[in-house]
């Protein structure tokens, strides 16, 4: 953008870089966004934002509607962005995705945000208890098997 005007050449370069990096499948050479499938549009939007190397990124359901390979690419890109010093807030209902991406996990329940816990300190069961409204959740001791 120069003087408030989008420079077509620069936008085209960014688009092609994102299309290649995130394997966006386009039906024709220069498709409009509305011509992309939901999954391809998701890949393009996530890729475009990641290409900007933002200092802060908030994403909601980042891998919704994409295939497993694209989901892995998106997750790794979010991890790389975080490791590069950016703050990345991921909102997702996919616990596997959260455990793979997050350093810390918090849960919203009944309009309240729980404390953020190190991801390694949480289990799916503990997250379920937080979702049910528990504020302090202690891991139950494991029973010895006879």
What are these regions (language model features)?
Residues 1-146:
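Glycine-rich phosphate-binding loops of nucleotide-dependent enzymes
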């Amino acid at each position: 953008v120069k003087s408030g005007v989008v420079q077509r050449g620069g936008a085209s370069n960014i688009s092609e870089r994102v299309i290649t990096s995130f394997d966006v499948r386009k039906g024709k050479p220069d498709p409009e966004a509305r011509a992309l499938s939901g999954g391809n549009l998701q890949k393009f939007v996530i890729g475009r934002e990641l290409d900007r190397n933002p200092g802060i990124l908030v994403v909601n359901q980042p891998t919704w509607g994409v295939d497993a390979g694209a989901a892995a690419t998106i997750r790794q890109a979010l991890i790389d962005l975080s490791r590069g010093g950016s703050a990345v807030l991921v909102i997702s209902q996919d616990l596997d995705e959260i455990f793979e991406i997050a350093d810390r996990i918090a849960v919203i329940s009944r309009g309240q945000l729980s404390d953020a816990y190190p991801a390694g300190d949480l289990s799916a069961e503990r997250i379920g208890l937080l979702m049910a409204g528990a504020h302090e959740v202690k891991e139950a001791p494991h029973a010895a098997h006879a």
